[in-house]
């Protein structure tokens, strides 16, 4: 079950490969995520010293958060993956045009995981083409529903 989806990622990028990564979170962040107070749209993944970090993922703290903890909504979160997977990602990201973007957050075995994708940015004409295809699929579905639901007139 997805907690939060980054719908803009699929529109702005061409997804090449998907990976699953664990996240290092604080207690107040887990509570806020369970309450649905998370936003991924501005998030991106960077590589520093052979480690992956999720930047721009906004987790809004709950009002009931403890007073001795000072929550930061835009805190950088470390992502956990196997070393060989990270090395492979670093090699791909160093190629021109590739980037790492978060696709969604979900639960797996009671833990919060992030799906990240190796992606290439789309050009403006690619975005327009995607929009045209989506509109055509929607229109086609409406036509088929209308055709099936209306009775046939034979005279």
UniProtKB/Swiss-Prot annotation:
CDD domains cross-referenced by the UniProt entry: SmpB (cd09294)
Keyword field? Cytoplasm, RNA-binding
Major location (coarse)? cytoplasm
Which Pfam families does the record match to this protein?
A: SmpB
- Enumerate the residue ranges of region (Disordered): 123-155
For bias kind Basic and acidic residues, which ranges apply? 123-142
Molecular-function annotations in GO: RNA binding
Q: Which InterPro entries match?
A: SmpB, SsrA-bd_prot, SsrA-bd_prot_CS
Gene Ontology process terms (BP): trans-translation
> Where is this protein localized, as stated in its record?
Cytoplasm
Name a single GO cellular component: cytosol
Quote the biased-composition stretches of kind Basic residues, using this chain's numbering.
Answer: 143-155
Explain the purpose of this protein.
Required for rescue of stalled ribosomes mediated by trans-translation. Binds to transfer-messenger RNA (tmRNA), required for stable association of tmRNA with ribosomes. tmRNA and SmpB together mimic tRNA shape, replacing the anticodon stem-loop with SmpB. tmRNA is encoded by the ssrA gene; the 2 termini fold to resemble tRNA(Ala) and it encodes a 'tag peptide', a short internal open reading frame. During trans-translation Ala-aminoacylated tmRNA acts like a tRNA, entering the A-site of stalled ribosomes, displacing the stalled mRNA.
HAMAP family assigned to the protein according to its UniProt record, in alphabetical order = SmpB
Q: Which family does it belong to?
A: Belongs to the SmpB family.
Record's protein name: SsrA-binding protein
Species annotation: Methylibium petroleiphilum (strain ATCC BAA-1232 / LMG 22953 / PM1)
């Amino acid at each position: 079950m997805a907690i939060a989806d980054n719908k803009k990622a699929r529109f702005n990028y061409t997804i090449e490969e998907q990976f699953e990564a664990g996240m290092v979170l604080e207690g107040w962040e887990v509570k806020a995520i369970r309450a649905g107070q998370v936003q991924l749209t501005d998030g991106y993944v960077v590589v520093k010293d052979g480690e992956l970090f999720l930047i721009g993922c906004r987790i809004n703290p709950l009002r009931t958060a403890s007073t001795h903890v000072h929550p930061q909504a835009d805190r950088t979160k470390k992502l956990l993956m196997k070393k060989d997977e990270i090395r492979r990602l670093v090699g791909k990201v160093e190629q021109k045009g590739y980037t790492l973007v978060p696709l969604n957050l979900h639960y797996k075995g009671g833990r919060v995981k992030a799906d990240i994708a190796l992606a290439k940015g789309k050009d403006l004409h690619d975005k327009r083409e995607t929009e045209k295809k989506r509109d055509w699929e929607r229109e086609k579905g409406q036509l088929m529903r209308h055709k099936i639901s209306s009775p046939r007139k034979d005279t």
